[in-house]
Amino acid sequence: MFNKIIVFGSVILLLASSCHQTAQQETTRSQEDFKKIDFHAHYRHDREYLLPLLDKWNMQALLIDVAKEDTARNRSQWEALKAQYSKYPDRFFLCASFESSNIDDPSFADKIIAKLENDFANGARMVKVWKVHGMVTRDGSGKFIQIDDPRIQPVWDFLTEKKVPVIAHIGEPLQAWLPLQEGNPHAGYYRDHPEYHAYNFPEIPAWETIMAARDNWIAKNPNLTIVAAHMGSMSHDLDLVAERLDKYPNMLVETAARWPDIVLQDPEKVRNFFLKYQDRVMYGTDFEIDTPFDPSKKEDDMGRRDNMDKRFGLHWEYLSGNDSLFFDRGSFKTHTHSINLPDSVLRKFYYENAMGVLTGE
């Protein structure tokens, strides 16, 4: 009897050891084994560290143009992105953009379509629309131009026919309509960019108004693939994001510049969100290189490189680990717990969903 107890106990220990090893394998994975696409980047200029850093993280990137207004500066930024793409076509994907300041022109839509056709001929696979729709640009009557304005509809019809997806940064985090709150993840941005702090400009439409216009636009274009950038400007509450994903099957989201909002929420809630919508969420950072190389600022450049590397690592630890985590993003710091997503979900989030959007497959 005593011998049987010893044998039985040994079996239990062996099973426990096996389970522990399995759990370890699931939570100590190597990021190099996971292909990645940063679905939201602005590398307008090259650096000697850029490709080695992306190699380290097994990463490609979508280079996104941002049309704020019809200016020579905006056009030069697009030329810079095209040059980057031409230099590294196996590393980068290209995303064009347009804005609507000339919406009163009767041939507005035709001119935008002609521009986009030229952009596609130069390699663009997507189109970006920015928060100037709803918050900045007005028509001749002084009315803010919302993204669901009927005068833009011919452009959406054209993109639907061409099967070209759109990435839309519409609106801002809710914080933009509130007084600056120290400790809020967005306080630094609105301190540095007061022109987008809607709280100071009561004439800017309410957050709810802009979100309603965005939702109406998505509903009116059910056959157009729409990626709502920055978690759809609803990153403070994943329940709001989930509500839209349930309602609009043509909508996806990406995480660029909204990681602090995400990690502030309950880790179990976040994990369940990523599991439920594993086919609809993509990785994004909003990292940029906005100026040509200046040898006198090489130290600043290397600081940027180290910051990018650190944040890539933080994102990976949060998603793949299974332990408490100090999420330190410089001006924003918090304690949380990583969410230990399965390999299959990580592969979709980091790569497969993005490739599906970019290739239409």
Segments the model singles out, each with a brief description of its role:
Residues 5-14:
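Sec-dependent N-terminal signal peptides
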Residues 16-18:
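C-terminal motif of bacterial Sec signal peptides marking the signal peptidase cleavage site
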Residues 22-90, 353:
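An N-terminally biased module of ancient metal coordination in phosphate/nucleic-acid-related enzymes
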Residues 27-29, 77-198, 202, 249-252, ...:
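Active-site gating/metal-coordination segments in enzymes
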Residues 37-41, 61-64, 93-97, 127-129, ...:
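Hydrophobic faces of well-ordered beta-strands that scaffold small-molecule active sites
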Residues 40-48, 67-77, 101-110, 137, ...:
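Acidic-and-aromatic substrate-binding clefts and catalytic sites of carbohydrate-active enzymes
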Residues 45-50, 73-84, 111-115, 210-215, ...:
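Alpha-helical scaffolding within the catalytic cores
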Residues 202, 208-216, 221-361:
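H/E-rich (His + Asp/Glu) clusters that bind or coordinate divalent metals
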